[in-house]
Swiss-Prot record:
Organism from which the protein derives: Wigglesworthia glossinidia brevipalpis
An example Gene Ontology molecular-function term: acyl-[acyl-carrier-protein]-UDP-N-acetylglucosamine O-acyltransferase activity
Domain of life the protein comes from: Bacteria
HAMAP family (alphabetical): LpxA (MF_00387)
Subunit field text: Homotrimer.
Protein name: Acyl-[acyl-carrier-protein]--UDP-N-acetylglucosamine O-acyltransferase
Keywords: Acyltransferase, Cytoplasm, Lipid A biosynthesis, Lipid biosynthesis, Lipid metabolism, Repeat, Transferase
Reactions accelerated catalytically: a (3R)-hydroxyacyl-[ACP] + UDP-N-acetyl-alpha-D-glucosamine = a UDP-3-O-[(3R)-3-hydroxyacyl]-N-acetyl-alpha-D-glucosamine + holo-[ACP]
Gene Ontology CC: cytoplasm; membrane
Listed Pfam families: Acetyltransf_11, Hexapep
Localization, UniProt: Cytoplasm
């Protein structure tokens, strides 16, 4: 179903049963598969391919030569009808790829709202990306990567499969992420190491001095010489009594499976 107010360029192919909502724009030479749904006011500039069981929300901009919902590159994949979900107000720049999930995981690759993926970003199967993230040119995510809110990843950075990157993290360009990255920190390098708190990012997002001070104390606990994970958790639980922002650290360590960068 194509809404009467949507525009589809005559050179584009929209398969039967695809759904395109009101005031969307499908530019020249696009391909929309039969199980795709595109939300209102979403723009496909040109030469965009959207395959498989894929939902694209409202007010997204997808630029030329991007591929969304294609079969993933996991060697175990054998054609299962897995999904891609993309929220609202995302910008997906040229040549970016977002692959569908696998049955070995949650069957879905999921993108939140208000993200910017710059040129040549690759998001592999089963990744989960929250909201307000920026990935610069040529960022590559392996399968099953989980990224929190307000994360900035510099260009040419590669993230190993199954890694977790906590909310409000900033990662410098040309980095290699092979372990989990705790919330609120700066990291860079190959392999990436921590460089303190993302103070500038927190100030821009309106964190007050008291909260930033508590986050700084959490950082000192995590990276105190000789502190093991059990002690870290105990000290963070105690610190969380003064500010619930510390729960982001506690949730991170509860879900971390690859160890964290040091």
């Amino acid at each position: 179903m194509i809404d009467k107010s949507a525009y589809v360029h005559p050179s584009s192919i929209v398969r039967k049963n695809a759904i395109i909502h009101a005031n969307s724009y499908v530019g020249p030479f696009c391909f929309i598969d039969s199980q795709v749904e595109i939300g209102a006011r979403t723009v496909l500039k040109s030469h965009v391919i959207i395959n498989g069981l894929t939902y694209v929300g409202e007010d997204n901009f997808i630029y030329q030569f991007s591929s969304i919902g294609e079969e993933n590159q996991d060697l175990k994949y054998s054609g299962e009808n897995t999904k891609v979900y993309i929220g609202d107000r995302n910008k997906i720049r040229e040549n970016s790829t977002i692959h569908r999930g696998t049955v070995q995981s949650n069957k879905i690759t999921k993108i939140g709202n208000d993200n910017l993926f710059m040129v040549n970003v690759h998001i592999a199967h089963d990744c989960v990306i929250e909201n307000n993230c920026v990935m610069a040119n040529n960022v590559t995510l392996g399968g099953h990567v989980k990224i929190g809110n307000h994360v900035v990843i510099g260009g040419m950075t590669a993230v190993h499969q199954n890694c977790i990157i906590g909310s409000h993290v900033m990662i410098g360009g040309c980095s290699g992420i092979s372990q989990d990255v705790p919330p609120f920190i700066l990291a860079q390098g190959n392999h990436a190491i921590p460089f303190g708190i993302n103070f500038e990012g927190l100030k821009r997002r309106g964190f007050d001095k008291k909260t930033i001070s508590v986050i700084k104390n959490a950082y000192k606990i995590i990276y105190k010489r000789g502190n093991n994970l059990n002690n870290i958790k105990k000290e963070l639980i105690k610190l969380s009594e003064s500010n619930k922002i510390i729960n982001l650290f506690l949730d991170f360590f509860s879900n971390s499976s690859r160890g964290f960068i040091r």
